[in-house]
């Protein structure tokens, strides 16, 4: 009996000691990196910047040459007035409910969720007036000084809390390539842009976050912008547009669809397809704290902004997009 008591005492000490050690480790983790002391909360004060302190961006990376495709196509898909939200990620975690661990907002296909298939997307209703059944989605933006009260505002968990800000506008746009004509995207091509784990990854190779203010279109930042009164907060998410010609998806979700290199030239072995660009705008009162939904360990870093799409246009719809881009016209659908 004495030995059993001594063993029980030892176990209790180990458990308590382990808990203390865990607390020390967690405290050390929360005090490291560029967001000291924030643990898994965030964002940090340094995640915000006055847009006036952001230098103007350089001009376009490359002017469209004589062999390029200078057109543009705007697809009218509304601004998620249907309140299509979920915690799924069809591109990254197909078949896994709540696999995103944060909330996504959608335009386009109204049936899109983790369980969607090519066939279900092809049959789904859409918010796009021209009949595009593609799904376009991104993590929601929240006001953290106001509690979320609706079910879709409280379902994500994992530290994602606050009132979801509705998009004041959503622009779905396709652009061409500055040095080449584009070829059609294949049906059900999956694509993603940005790095949802940018805070912990450290390296910035996949970071594509572009935050800004509507009154300063020449300034963009990877931090949350403080905008002048009357301006909208903007997010611009440009997707890779060089397809390997074979696959609609890939392990890691990037190798089949890559970004152009310098001057807009696609990497060897890839072909230029229409470049998708999403531009989101929000009404944010001056000084209101905002945070993009994220994995808990990413601390709502603005650098983690990202978006995904699945192309469900018909071959005819995509052909019209390609023709508009390659002939240098500005079209709407």
Residue ranges of model-derived segments:
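Secretory targeting and sorting signals
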Residues: 2-32
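Primary mode marks residue(s) on the alpha4-beta5-alpha5 output face of response regulator receiver
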Residues: 33-101, 105-237, 244-333
